[in-house]
Amino acid sequence: MGMSLQLLGINLRIKVILATSWLFENIAKVCGYPTKTLGMPIRTDVIPGYGLPIHQTRVPPFANPTTFLEAVFGNIPQPSTIEKFYYESPQDGYYNFYIPHYRNVVFLPDWLSKWIQLHFDLGIDTVGLETIRNTLFSMLVYFYFFAELRIMLSYFISINPYTRPWVYLISLTDWIYDILFHLGISKRVVLLGFPLLPILIHAALGNLIDSLNHLVFTMPFLPSEGEPGEFLIDGTARKVLLFRYLPALWTSEPIPDRLREFWYTERPEIYQFMKKNYGHLDIDFLPDEILKQIYQFKHDQIDPNSLTKNVEQFKVLGAQLISDSTIDFYQFSNCFVHKQEILFTFFSDYMDRLI
């Protein structure tokens, strides 16, 4: 009896599938498929990141102990970050790098990246930012475990979570619900008796942790300066994002002085490259101390005493020129009057003779 019912169910399932297939095929034939049209075309240009690989990570990360203590108590969780590859070339310059072009790569906004570089005088070194990212990742992973344990406690009726030591766990996690409650979001959202808000918060926390895995710092470039390209890596052409040439921020804001001092004292070839290729952009590539010395040297060449002497000489020379011109004009006028009198006398004598 049971076998016959099972066969009846299988036959009914097959008939439903065949009927559905026949219905869709006939509807498609009415629309001209497959002789006139092959169906709706797929537009890949409107799909962001189409064809790009995905940076695969896991939240929480797998345990990776390296010592006996870490094997017993657990190791500090570390993010699975996207690696940056630096390179130098005579055409692109000295501060170029590329990263694998993943679909889920995460960058800081341009305005935030610019603000960090200007206010914290960041140049090339992003070790400090990466340390902050790794520390934040570890803290969020631990908080993720606490939140997960808090959700599990709500399923055990025999455990009163408001007694010690469980009350400490509630103090660590329930502040999120208090904030949401003040924002007007009630935690009494349930589905079939299960609270949904803790699960949603847990999922959002996992998404935030995973975003730190894909976060890439692009200093000294802005994230929008990345150029899609392809590199031959391990014999395979892979899509990458290139950050090369002169960072756009250095054309509008001063280059960090520590970096310019490093070029001038330890890497003069970088200074020569910058001066040769970007000297026309009116950018200061010399350190501030050298620029001050150059300015002071130019200022000292103009002696204020010599300027005063030159001004007095100009005054004397001007007065002499005016005096000489006055004397010359007086002599010229006397000569002109004398010649005029001679001419008038000669003309008078000539007229008297005619009369």
From Swiss-Prot:
Subcellular location: Plastid, Chloroplast
GO cellular component, one term: chloroplast
Keywords: Chloroplast, Plastid
Keyword Chloroplast part of the UniProt annotation: yes
Location, primary (coarse class): plastid
Domain of life where this protein originates: Eukaryota
Family: Belongs to the ycf89 family.
Name this protein carries in UniProt: Uncharacterized protein ycf89
Organism encoding this protein: Trieres chinensis
Gene: ycf89-A
